[in-house]
Amino acid sequence: MPELTRERLGALRVQAKELLAADRREVLVCAGTGCIAGGSLKIYDYLKSECEKRGLKTRVALRHEGGDDAIHFKKSGCHGFCEMGPLLQIEPEGFLYTHVRLEDCDEIIERTILGGEAVERLLYELNGVRYAKHNEIPFYAKQQRVVLENCGTSDAEDIEEYIAKGGYSAFEKALFEMTDEEICRDILDSGLRG
């Protein structure tokens, strides 16, 4: 394995950001424990295989071969909204579907993946109002996520996507900018325990 340098890490981050910036069709299936218990991995497998049966190109990694028109299937981390799972998010529209079941998958493929339309009955509803997008839902709208800002939006199994979204930046700073003493002081000053 080649030596890790700041330049190599920076180049990898730039490449991954470029791949991530493209306005492509993405299907993010929550792979948090609550959603998995509700069947999200079966939903992921079914959606991906059914799209392939219909002749649609699919991919499961940020870096791939086969063209930019491939549908990117992702297993995301927990969205923090477990009682509404299994959750499914479709990009670029940003639709967030709740309580998704296997029986919903064919309609999702037809209406959303192929047609770009929301399946209204799967959108989050509160007091008679349906919310199409994650950031519109009152539960999320009042939150200011810092450490978990990418939770539910990233492929939990793709390290390049993690790096593109700033992953390892603290490690990079510690490795290339700080002394051992500064690292120890920052950790002690942070008050972290455990």
Where are these regions (language model features)?
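Feature of Fe-S/electron-transfer and energy-metabolism proteins
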Residues: 1-194
